[in-house]
Amino acid sequence: ALGDGVLDAKTKELIALGMAITARCVYCIGIHVEKSLRAGVSHAEIVEVCKVAIVMGGGPAMTYIAEVKKALDLFEQAHA
């Protein structure tokens, strides 16, 4: 379901990340940050997804942006 189709895998991972943030799923956020980066998503694109998730999910979603940052940091450390 997350591979290339009418929407490419990169776009689907961005959608999945936004949904993970609004669902407040720490595990899902970590997985989809990693999969997004592996699919070629930029940090700027992840930041934009975070902004959309905050608009859609409000304050509760905002608190989970820290989990996105943690996942980005872990990915960078593992691939430095």
Feature roles, as predicted:
Residues 15, 19-31, 56:
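Short, thiol/selenol-centered motifs that function as redox-active sites or metal-ligating centers
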Residues 17, 48-62, 75:
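N-terminal hydrophobic signal/anchor transmembrane helix of membrane proteins
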